[in-house]
Protein backbone atom coordinates (compact mmCIF):
# COMPACT_ATOMS: atom_id res chain seq x y z
CA UNK A 1 0.00 0.00 0.00
CA UNK A 2 2.80 2.41 0.92
CA UNK A 3 4.63 1.72 -2.35
CA UNK A 4 1.41 2.33 -4.28
CA UNK A 5 0.91 5.69 -2.55
CA UNK A 6 4.51 6.68 -3.26
CA UNK A 7 4.07 5.78 -6.93
CA UNK A 8 0.92 7.92 -7.18
CA UNK A 9 2.70 10.80 -5.42
CA UNK A 10 5.65 10.58 -7.80
CA UNK A 11 3.45 10.54 -10.90
CA UNK A 12 0.58 12.79 -9.85
CA UNK A 13 1.70 14.65 -6.74
CA UNK A 14 -0.26 15.28 -3.56
CA UNK A 15 -3.37 16.18 -5.55
CA UNK A 16 -3.42 12.67 -7.02
CA UNK A 17 -2.97 11.07 -3.59
CA UNK A 18 -5.81 13.14 -2.11
CA UNK A 19 -8.06 12.28 -5.07
CA UNK A 20 -7.50 8.55 -4.46
CA UNK A 21 -8.14 8.93 -0.73
CA UNK A 22 -11.41 10.79 -1.31
CA UNK A 23 -12.60 8.16 -3.77
CA UNK A 24 -11.69 5.38 -1.33
CA UNK A 25 -13.58 7.03 1.50
CA UNK A 26 -16.67 7.67 -0.60
CA UNK A 27 -16.74 4.05 -1.75
CA UNK A 28 -16.91 2.71 1.79
CA UNK A 29 -20.17 2.11 3.59
CA UNK A 30 -21.22 4.84 5.98
CA UNK A 31 -20.92 2.48 8.95
CA UNK A 32 -17.21 2.05 8.26
CA UNK A 33 -16.44 5.75 7.99
CA UNK A 34 -14.89 7.47 10.98
CA UNK A 35 -16.92 10.63 11.37
CA UNK A 36 -15.13 13.96 11.32
CA UNK A 37 -15.37 16.10 14.44
CA UNK A 38 -15.62 19.60 13.02
CA UNK A 39 -15.97 21.28 16.40
CA UNK A 40 -12.86 19.58 17.71
CA UNK A 41 -10.86 20.51 14.60
CA UNK A 42 -11.80 24.19 14.99
CA UNK A 43 -11.78 24.20 18.79
CA UNK A 44 -9.09 26.90 18.76
CA UNK A 45 -11.77 29.23 17.36
CA UNK A 46 -14.57 28.20 19.72
CA UNK A 47 -12.35 28.35 22.79
CA UNK A 48 -10.75 31.70 21.98
CA UNK A 49 -13.62 34.14 22.03
CA UNK A 50 -13.04 36.09 25.23
CA UNK A 51 -10.32 38.59 26.04
CA UNK A 52 -9.68 37.77 29.69
CA UNK A 53 -7.63 40.75 30.82
CA UNK A 54 -5.45 40.18 33.87
CA UNK A 55 -3.75 42.69 36.12
CA UNK A 56 0.03 42.42 36.25
CA UNK A 57 3.08 44.61 36.70
CA UNK A 58 5.94 44.68 34.20
CA UNK A 59 7.51 47.93 35.38
CA UNK A 60 11.29 48.12 35.59
CA UNK A 61 11.75 45.23 33.14
CA UNK A 62 13.06 45.12 29.60
CA UNK A 63 10.41 45.10 26.89
CA UNK A 64 9.17 41.52 26.51
CA UNK A 65 7.50 40.28 23.32
CA UNK A 66 5.65 36.99 22.96
CA UNK A 67 5.55 35.74 19.35
CA UNK A 68 2.88 33.13 18.54
CA UNK A 69 3.89 31.19 15.43
CA UNK A 70 2.65 28.35 13.20
CA UNK A 71 4.62 25.06 13.23
CA UNK A 72 8.18 25.06 11.94
CA UNK A 73 9.22 23.60 8.59
CA UNK A 74 12.27 23.97 6.32
CA UNK A 75 12.19 26.82 3.82
CA UNK A 76 9.40 28.88 5.38
CA UNK A 77 9.95 32.46 4.25
CA UNK A 78 7.51 33.77 6.84
CA UNK A 79 9.48 32.24 9.70
CA UNK A 80 12.76 33.51 8.25
CA UNK A 81 11.35 37.05 8.19
CA UNK A 82 10.21 36.84 11.81
CA UNK A 83 13.60 35.56 13.01
CA UNK A 84 15.26 38.39 11.08
CA UNK A 85 13.25 40.94 13.07
CA UNK A 86 13.78 39.06 16.33
CA UNK A 87 17.53 39.30 15.73
CA UNK A 88 17.25 43.06 15.24
CA UNK A 89 14.95 43.67 18.20
CA UNK A 90 17.23 41.66 20.47
CA UNK A 91 20.11 43.99 19.50
CA UNK A 92 17.86 46.83 20.70
CA UNK A 93 17.50 45.24 24.14
CA UNK A 94 14.08 43.62 23.64
CA UNK A 95 13.51 40.14 25.08
CA UNK A 96 11.70 37.72 22.77
CA UNK A 97 9.83 34.49 23.40
CA UNK A 98 8.55 32.25 20.59
CA UNK A 99 5.57 29.94 21.12
CA UNK A 100 3.92 27.52 18.70
CA UNK A 101 0.18 28.13 18.88
CA UNK A 102 -0.61 24.42 19.35
CA UNK A 103 1.18 21.14 20.00
CA UNK A 104 2.38 19.60 16.74
CA UNK A 105 4.84 16.89 17.71
CA UNK A 106 7.77 16.06 19.93
CA UNK A 107 9.48 19.42 19.72
CA UNK A 108 11.42 20.70 22.72
CA UNK A 109 12.61 24.18 23.60
CA UNK A 110 16.12 23.18 22.58
CA UNK A 111 15.18 21.53 19.28
CA UNK A 112 13.02 24.48 18.21
CA UNK A 113 15.79 26.96 18.90
CA UNK A 114 18.34 24.87 17.01
CA UNK A 115 15.90 24.54 14.09
CA UNK A 116 15.52 28.33 14.00
CA UNK A 117 19.31 28.72 13.96
CA UNK A 118 19.78 26.09 11.24
CA UNK A 119 16.91 27.00 8.92
CA UNK A 120 15.72 30.52 9.76
CA UNK A 121 19.03 32.32 10.37
CA UNK A 122 18.39 33.06 14.04
CA UNK A 123 21.58 34.42 15.60
CA UNK A 124 23.69 31.60 17.00
CA UNK A 125 24.00 33.34 20.38
CA UNK A 126 20.41 34.55 20.58
CA UNK A 127 18.77 34.69 24.01
CA UNK A 128 15.32 34.15 22.48
CA UNK A 129 13.30 31.52 24.34
CA UNK A 130 11.35 28.86 22.42
CA UNK A 131 8.31 26.88 23.57
CA UNK A 132 6.46 24.08 21.71
CA UNK A 133 3.03 25.25 22.89
CA UNK A 134 1.21 28.12 24.60
CA UNK A 135 0.03 26.25 27.70
CA UNK A 136 2.15 28.32 30.07
CA UNK A 137 2.68 31.49 28.07
CA UNK A 138 3.97 34.17 30.40
CA UNK A 139 3.24 37.88 30.83
CA UNK A 140 4.55 40.28 28.18
CA UNK A 141 4.37 43.90 27.12
CA UNK A 142 3.31 42.88 23.61
CA UNK A 143 1.98 39.60 22.20
CA UNK A 144 2.21 39.17 18.43
CA UNK A 145 0.04 36.95 16.26
CA UNK A 146 1.72 35.83 13.03
CA UNK A 147 -1.04 33.88 11.25
CA UNK A 148 -4.82 33.73 11.28
CA UNK A 149 -4.86 30.61 13.49
CA UNK A 150 -2.52 32.14 16.04
CA UNK A 151 -4.64 35.32 16.09
CA UNK A 152 -7.47 33.42 17.78
CA UNK A 153 -5.20 32.45 20.65
CA UNK A 154 -3.79 35.97 20.99
CA UNK A 155 -7.33 37.35 21.04
CA UNK A 156 -8.09 35.43 24.24
CA UNK A 157 -4.68 35.84 25.89
CA UNK A 158 -4.99 38.18 28.86
CA UNK A 159 -1.44 38.33 30.20
CA UNK A 160 -0.28 41.09 27.88
CA UNK A 161 -0.57 44.85 27.64
CA UNK A 162 -0.83 45.12 23.84
CA UNK A 163 -1.71 42.87 20.92
CA UNK A 164 -0.07 43.12 17.51
CA UNK A 165 -0.69 41.27 14.25
CA UNK A 166 2.43 40.59 12.12
CA UNK A 167 0.73 40.19 8.74
CA UNK A 168 2.80 38.86 5.83
CA UNK A 169 0.02 38.03 3.38
CA UNK A 170 -3.74 38.33 2.92
CA UNK A 171 -4.46 34.87 4.29
CA UNK A 172 -8.20 34.62 3.47
CA UNK A 173 -7.15 34.28 -0.17
CA UNK A 174 -5.28 31.09 0.67
CA UNK A 175 -8.75 29.50 0.54
CA UNK A 176 -11.82 29.47 -1.72
CA UNK A 177 -14.77 31.53 -0.42
CA UNK A 178 -15.29 28.97 2.34
CA UNK A 179 -15.56 28.83 6.12
CA UNK A 180 -11.76 29.03 6.36
CA UNK A 181 -11.81 32.21 4.26
CA UNK A 182 -14.11 33.90 6.77
CA UNK A 183 -12.30 32.43 9.80
CA UNK A 184 -9.12 34.08 8.48
CA UNK A 185 -10.81 37.33 7.45
CA UNK A 186 -12.44 37.77 10.86
CA UNK A 187 -9.04 38.05 12.53
CA UNK A 188 -8.54 41.46 10.94
CA UNK A 189 -11.49 42.69 12.99
CA UNK A 190 -9.98 41.75 16.37
CA UNK A 191 -8.63 45.25 17.04
CA UNK A 192 -4.94 44.34 16.91
CA UNK A 193 -2.34 46.82 15.68
CA UNK A 194 -0.99 45.57 12.33
CA UNK A 195 2.63 45.42 11.23
CA UNK A 196 2.55 44.40 7.58
CA UNK A 197 4.97 43.13 4.96
CA UNK A 198 4.80 45.97 2.47
CA UNK A 199 2.37 48.82 1.84
CA UNK A 200 -0.25 46.85 -0.13
CA UNK A 201 -1.31 44.92 2.97
CA UNK A 202 -1.22 48.00 5.18
CA UNK A 203 -3.49 49.96 2.84
CA UNK A 204 -5.85 47.03 2.32
CA UNK A 205 -6.30 46.22 6.00
CA UNK A 206 -6.66 49.89 6.94
CA UNK A 207 -9.26 50.53 4.25
CA UNK A 208 -11.29 47.31 4.40
CA UNK A 209 -11.07 46.49 8.12
CA UNK A 210 -10.17 49.82 9.77
CA UNK A 211 -7.01 48.31 11.26
CA UNK A 212 -4.32 50.58 12.62
CA UNK A 213 -1.41 49.46 10.41
CA UNK A 214 2.27 50.15 9.87
CA UNK A 215 4.32 48.56 7.10
CA UNK A 216 7.96 47.71 6.53
CA UNK A 217 9.80 47.31 3.23
CA UNK A 218 11.44 44.20 1.80
CA UNK A 219 15.13 43.64 1.27
CA UNK A 220 17.49 40.69 0.77
CA UNK A 221 20.60 39.08 2.24
CA UNK A 222 23.39 41.21 0.82
CA UNK A 223 26.04 38.66 1.75
CA UNK A 224 24.38 36.02 -0.44
CA UNK A 225 22.70 37.70 -3.41
CA UNK A 226 25.18 39.33 -5.79
CA UNK A 227 25.62 39.53 -9.57
CA UNK A 228 27.67 36.89 -11.39
CA UNK A 229 28.81 36.94 -15.03
CA UNK A 230 26.13 35.55 -17.35
CA UNK A 231 27.11 32.80 -19.78
CA UNK A 232 27.65 34.12 -23.28
CA UNK A 233 26.90 30.96 -25.27
CA UNK A 234 23.84 32.01 -27.25
CA UNK A 235 21.37 30.40 -24.83
CA UNK A 236 18.92 32.56 -22.86
CA UNK A 237 18.34 31.04 -19.42
CA UNK A 238 14.94 31.41 -17.78
CA UNK A 239 13.99 30.42 -14.24
CA UNK A 240 10.55 29.95 -12.69
CA UNK A 241 9.80 30.20 -8.98
CA UNK A 242 7.79 26.97 -9.11
CA UNK A 243 5.60 26.25 -6.08
CA UNK A 244 3.18 23.62 -7.36
CA UNK A 245 1.55 23.06 -3.95
CA UNK A 246 1.16 26.79 -3.25
CA UNK A 247 -1.80 27.96 -5.39
CA UNK A 248 -1.07 31.67 -4.91
CA UNK A 249 2.21 31.24 -6.83
CA UNK A 250 0.17 30.59 -10.03
CA UNK A 251 2.13 27.53 -11.15
CA UNK A 252 -0.31 26.28 -13.81
CA UNK A 253 -0.66 29.74 -15.36
CA UNK A 254 3.07 30.03 -15.93
CA UNK A 255 3.49 26.43 -17.09
CA UNK A 256 1.03 27.19 -19.90
CA UNK A 257 2.74 30.48 -20.69
CA UNK A 258 6.10 28.77 -20.96
CA UNK A 259 4.66 26.23 -23.40
CA UNK A 260 3.42 29.01 -25.72
CA UNK A 261 6.75 30.79 -25.34
CA UNK A 262 8.84 27.66 -25.99
CA UNK A 263 6.95 26.81 -29.18
CA UNK A 264 7.61 30.31 -30.51
CA UNK A 265 11.30 30.02 -29.64
CA UNK A 266 11.55 26.68 -31.45
CA UNK A 267 9.82 28.10 -34.52
CA UNK A 268 12.32 30.98 -34.68
CA UNK A 269 15.42 28.97 -33.69
CA UNK A 270 15.88 30.83 -30.38
CA UNK A 271 17.85 28.74 -27.89
CA UNK A 272 16.50 28.81 -24.34
CA UNK A 273 17.00 26.79 -21.17
CA UNK A 274 14.19 26.61 -18.60
CA UNK A 275 14.76 25.82 -14.90
CA UNK A 276 12.18 25.36 -12.13
CA UNK A 277 13.19 26.23 -8.57
CA UNK A 278 11.08 25.89 -5.42
CA UNK A 279 9.61 22.38 -5.35
CA UNK A 280 10.30 19.02 -6.94
CA UNK A 281 8.18 18.73 -10.10
CA UNK A 282 9.57 15.43 -11.39
CA UNK A 283 6.10 13.87 -11.19
CA UNK A 284 4.71 16.30 -13.80
CA UNK A 285 5.04 15.91 -17.56
CA UNK A 286 5.97 19.10 -19.41
CA UNK A 287 5.84 19.50 -23.22
CA UNK A 288 9.23 21.27 -23.11
CA UNK A 289 12.56 20.47 -21.41
CA UNK A 290 12.75 21.54 -17.76
CA UNK A 291 15.75 21.58 -15.46
CA UNK A 292 14.07 20.52 -12.20
CA UNK A 293 16.05 22.06 -9.32
CA UNK A 294 13.45 21.31 -6.64
CA UNK A 295 13.84 22.70 -3.12
CA UNK A 296 17.34 24.04 -2.55
CA UNK A 297 19.27 25.15 0.51
CA UNK A 298 19.32 28.92 0.97
CA UNK A 299 23.06 29.11 0.34
CA UNK A 300 22.65 27.49 -3.11
CA UNK A 301 19.79 29.67 -4.38
CA UNK A 302 21.77 32.88 -5.16
CA UNK A 303 23.90 31.10 -7.78
CA UNK A 304 20.74 29.96 -9.61
CA UNK A 305 19.26 33.47 -9.48
CA UNK A 306 22.47 34.99 -10.84
CA UNK A 307 23.06 32.45 -13.63
CA UNK A 308 19.63 32.95 -15.19
CA UNK A 309 19.02 35.86 -17.55
CA UNK A 310 15.31 36.09 -16.69
CA UNK A 311 13.40 34.84 -13.66
CA UNK A 312 9.61 34.47 -13.43
CA UNK A 313 8.35 35.35 -9.95
CA UNK A 314 4.54 35.06 -10.01
CA UNK A 315 2.24 35.83 -7.10
CA UNK A 316 -1.53 35.99 -6.75
CA UNK A 317 -1.33 37.56 -3.29
CA UNK A 318 1.51 39.43 -1.58
CA UNK A 319 4.97 39.15 -3.10
CA UNK A 320 7.60 36.82 -1.74
CA UNK A 321 11.18 38.01 -1.22
CA UNK A 322 12.28 36.28 -4.44
CA UNK A 323 11.77 39.28 -6.80
CA UNK A 324 14.25 41.43 -4.87
CA UNK A 325 16.69 38.53 -4.53
CA UNK A 326 16.56 38.04 -8.30
CA UNK A 327 16.98 41.75 -8.99
CA UNK A 328 19.97 41.88 -6.63
CA UNK A 329 21.70 39.39 -8.96
CA UNK A 330 21.14 41.63 -12.03
CA UNK A 331 18.64 39.11 -13.37
CA UNK A 332 15.46 40.41 -14.98
CA UNK A 333 12.38 39.78 -12.81
CA UNK A 334 9.05 39.06 -14.52
CA UNK A 335 5.81 39.11 -12.52
CA UNK A 336 2.08 39.67 -12.94
CA UNK A 337 0.43 43.05 -12.52
CA UNK A 338 -1.75 43.92 -9.53
CA UNK A 339 -1.70 46.08 -6.43
CA UNK A 340 -0.29 43.09 -4.55
CA UNK A 341 2.86 43.29 -6.72
CA UNK A 342 3.08 46.91 -7.85
CA UNK A 343 3.71 48.30 -4.37
CA UNK A 344 7.28 47.05 -5.04
CA UNK A 345 7.58 46.23 -8.75
CA UNK A 346 7.09 48.59 -11.69
CA UNK A 347 7.85 48.90 -15.40
CA UNK A 348 11.24 50.45 -14.63
CA UNK A 349 12.66 47.68 -12.43
CA UNK A 350 10.92 44.59 -13.85
CA UNK A 351 8.63 43.24 -16.56
CA UNK A 352 4.96 43.19 -15.54
CA UNK A 353 2.34 41.17 -17.40
CA UNK A 354 -1.35 40.43 -17.26
CA UNK A 355 -2.30 37.18 -15.51
CA UNK A 356 -2.80 35.62 -18.93
CA UNK A 357 -0.54 32.94 -20.46
CA UNK A 358 -0.54 34.60 -23.89
CA UNK A 359 0.52 37.99 -22.52
CA UNK A 360 3.18 36.40 -20.33
CA UNK A 361 4.55 34.43 -23.28
CA UNK A 362 4.64 37.48 -25.57
CA UNK A 363 6.42 39.72 -23.06
CA UNK A 364 8.83 36.95 -22.13
CA UNK A 365 9.68 36.37 -25.80
CA UNK A 366 10.24 40.09 -26.34
CA UNK A 367 12.92 40.34 -23.64
CA UNK A 368 14.40 37.00 -24.68
CA UNK A 369 15.22 38.26 -28.18
CA UNK A 370 15.98 41.84 -27.09
CA UNK A 371 19.16 41.58 -25.03
CA UNK A 372 19.63 45.33 -24.76
CA UNK A 373 16.18 45.86 -23.21
CA UNK A 374 16.63 42.85 -20.94
CA UNK A 375 19.94 44.04 -19.56
CA UNK A 376 18.76 47.65 -19.20
CA UNK A 377 15.76 46.73 -17.02
CA UNK A 378 17.85 44.18 -15.09
CA UNK A 379 20.36 46.96 -14.32
CA UNK A 380 17.55 49.26 -13.17
CA UNK A 381 16.18 46.46 -11.00
CA UNK A 382 19.61 45.97 -9.45
CA UNK A 383 19.95 49.69 -8.69
CA UNK A 384 16.52 49.59 -7.05
CA UNK A 385 17.29 46.49 -4.97
CA UNK A 386 20.60 47.68 -3.54
CA UNK A 387 18.90 50.73 -2.02
CA UNK A 388 16.75 48.51 0.19
CA UNK A 389 17.90 47.50 3.65
CA UNK A 390 16.76 45.06 6.33
CA UNK A 391 18.44 47.36 8.83
CA UNK A 392 16.03 50.16 7.86
CA UNK A 393 13.07 47.79 8.06
CA UNK A 394 14.19 46.50 11.45
CA UNK A 395 14.51 50.04 12.78
CA UNK A 396 11.04 50.87 11.49
CA UNK A 397 9.49 47.86 13.26
CA UNK A 398 11.39 48.75 16.45
CA UNK A 399 10.02 52.31 16.36
CA UNK A 400 6.48 51.01 15.78
CA UNK A 401 6.77 48.81 18.86
CA UNK A 402 8.14 51.68 20.95
CA UNK A 403 5.34 53.96 19.71
CA UNK A 404 2.67 51.37 20.55
CA UNK A 405 3.97 51.14 24.10
CA UNK A 406 4.38 54.90 24.58
CA UNK A 407 1.14 55.94 22.87
CA UNK A 408 -0.99 53.38 24.66
CA UNK A 409 0.52 54.24 28.03
CA UNK A 410 -0.44 57.91 27.55
CA UNK A 411 -4.14 57.04 27.25
Predicted regions and their residues:
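Short acidic/histidine- and often glycine-rich active-site loop of Leloir-type glycosyltransferases
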Residues: 325, 337-352
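A short, well-ordered alpha-helix in the C-terminal region of glycosyltransferases
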Residues: 359, 366, 373-387, 395-399, ...
Amino acid sequence: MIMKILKIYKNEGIKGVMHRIRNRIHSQKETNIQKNNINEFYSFIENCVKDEKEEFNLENTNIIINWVLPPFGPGSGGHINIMRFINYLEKKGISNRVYLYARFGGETQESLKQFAIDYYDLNQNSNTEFYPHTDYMDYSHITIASSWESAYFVRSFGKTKHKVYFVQDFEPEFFPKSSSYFFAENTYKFGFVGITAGSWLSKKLSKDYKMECYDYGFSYDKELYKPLPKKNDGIVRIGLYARYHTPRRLFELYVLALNIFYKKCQKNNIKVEISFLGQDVSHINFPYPVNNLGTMKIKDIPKVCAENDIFLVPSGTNLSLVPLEVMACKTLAVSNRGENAEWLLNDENSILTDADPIDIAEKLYEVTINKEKREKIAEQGYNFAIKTSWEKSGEKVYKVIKNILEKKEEK
